[in-house]
Every structure is written in C-alpha cells, then in structure tokens.
C-alpha cells in the first residue's frame, strides 16, 4: 500500500513536477533568481527545484550549489532539449530583496535583470 500511496504523493512533489518544465513543448525561456539567505523562499527550496529542472548556475557564483554546472553569463540559448536550444539559468543576489516598491540596490538589479530577460530572452548578470 505504501508504494502505491507514494506514487500518488509524488505527483504533488515540486521537485518531481519541476523536471517537467523542460519536458513539455514548446520549452520556454526560464530565469530563476535566488537571494542568498532568503527567508521567503529558502535557498534550499530554490536549489532543489533548479537541480530537478537541470538549470545551470550563471556567473558570478556567490555560493556554490552542489550538482549545478557553473556557466558564464550572459546566457542565450544555452541549454539543449529535443526541441532545440533555449535560454535558462539561475542567478544569485547578495541579499534578500524586494523589487516591489523600490527595494534595495540588489532589488533594482534583480528587477532590471528580469525586465531585460522578458524583453530579450537573454540572461545578463553584473558583478
């Protein structure tokens, strides 16, 4: 019974569901942003999701993440799928931030990165 129950529970597991993001057609560009020591979405949660999807960590690396390849930025069509190339990656920021309502300098960098990504499908970072 427990094996059967586990298969039902697995469908709701975010780490398992996250892997499907790049298995569906068409694959869409994907930017994931992580604020080091975030207390809203814990880094461990973000990292499990990113590992499950198979995304790289884009430079600059603020904290190494086990199981993620480090790639240079900017990123454009940097990952391959059976349907072709797409842009995706994880970027890190030095502090917890909010780009809603102004936020910190890091928040402004994160917002600029997100806007640029949405406009160009290119992931840019700055050191």
Which stretches of residues belong to each language-model region?
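C-terminal subdomain of alpha/beta-hydrolase-fold enzymes, centered on the catalytic histidine
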Residues: 1-127
